[in-house]
Amino acid sequence: MHNLTLFESGGDNVSCGGSSLGCPNGSSLAPLPLPQPLAVAVPVVYGVICAVGLAGNSAVLYVLLRTPRMKTVTNVFILNLAIADELFTLVLPINIADFLLRRWPFGEVMCKLIVAVDQYNTFSSLYFLAVMSADRYLVVLATAESRRVSGRTYGAARAVSLAVWALVTLVVLPFAVFARLDEEQGRRQCVLVFPQPEAFWWRASRLYTLVLGFAIPVTTICALYTTLLCRLRAIQLDSHAKALDRAKKRVTLLVAAILAVCLLCWTPYHLSTIVALTTDLPQTPLVIGISYFITSLSYANSCLNPFLYAFLDDSFRRSLRQLVSCRSA
């Protein structure tokens, strides 16, 4: 079950090349012949992402949950990002099995669950990054003005995180509703079965993901940082504010790095949605290969964040070393 949006279409007799997520009902489910290098590379790449993601995000969860001094507002949001990434990497082996078997052997309940988790992966990262950007906006602006942010507490951050999960659940619910098993030419697949006219519903689902999963959160993030830069230019920092600004600069850098990596991984995926909606690309080996590359890039976001924490967060590195040394002792 792979989001290969470059050659998805809302019309009939459109194969998804082993990718069932997003295929409309009535589409041809016959497996496309994949080039041998691609047939080998895709499960290997997915397997590496799964292994690295599970190890890295497990380490992040372990450090953030076991170290009292790591219980900060920013780390609450980082913890939830790690939970979302860990959840996705836990089910990635099912995607690998689906790719290798070229059919869905896991039943309809699992089909709906995996589709939902896949969509959680699509929406949750940018939603939490939008919240983290809003938090950075408030903190940096308050620091520049030598004041505190009222109500910015660990408990409030947890409440906001729960609200984000609730919102993402509502957003991904339609995908779980439409997901079901469909069989054609002897192949059972987990697909999104849209009502008639299926072309309309398919396009609506792609626009839904593009707008709610990318355009709105990215626009919000850009607006926050643009407004922040404009306001900072108009403020003269006193010595106390400059000291606080230096102390918080590393956290802001970490959030900006996480955001940059997320956009790098997810922008091609959402741009490919625009291509799929506006063009009718032939299903050539090159197009299929590009589609799998874009999908793999979006999946890779789930395993990259722990490396950012390790390189950019001194507290995380120290806490991880201490916990590892304690367990060794």
Curated annotation (Swiss-Prot):
Compartmental location: Cell membrane
Any one GO molecular function term: neuropeptide receptor activity
GO biological-process terms attached to the record: regulation of metabolic process
InterPro entries recorded: GPCR_Rhodpsn (IPR000276), GPCR_Rhodpsn_7TM (IPR017452), Neuropept_B/W_rcpt (IPR009150)
Keywords from the UniProt entry: Cell membrane, Disulfide bond, G-protein coupled receptor, Glycoprotein, Membrane, Receptor, Transducer, Transmembrane, Transmembrane helix
Cystine bridges: 111-190
PROSITE patterns: G_PROTEIN_RECEP_F1_1 (PS00237), G_PROTEIN_RECEP_F1_2 (PS50262)
Top-level taxon in the UniProt lineage: Eukaryota
Stretches in topological domain Extracellular: 1-43, 97-112, 180-209, 272-289
Primary site of residence: membrane
Membrane topology of this protein: Multi-pass membrane protein
GO cellular component, one term: plasma membrane
The keyword Disulfide bond belongs to this UniProt entry's keyword annotation: yes
Xref: CDD domains: 7tmA_NPBWR
Transmembrane region(s): 44-64, 76-96, 113-133, 159-179, 210-230, 251-271, 290-312
Glycosylated residues in this chain: 3, 13, 25
Cytoplasmic topological segments: 65-75, 134-158, 231-250, 313-329
Alphabetized Pfam families for the sequence: 7tm_1
UniProt family annotation: Belongs to the G-protein coupled receptor 1 family.
Reported function: Interacts specifically with a number of opioid ligands. Receptor for neuropeptides B and W, which may be involved in neuroendocrine system regulation, food intake and the organization of other signals.
Name of the protein: Neuropeptides B/W receptor type 1
Organism field: Mus musculus (Mouse)
Gene: Npbwr1
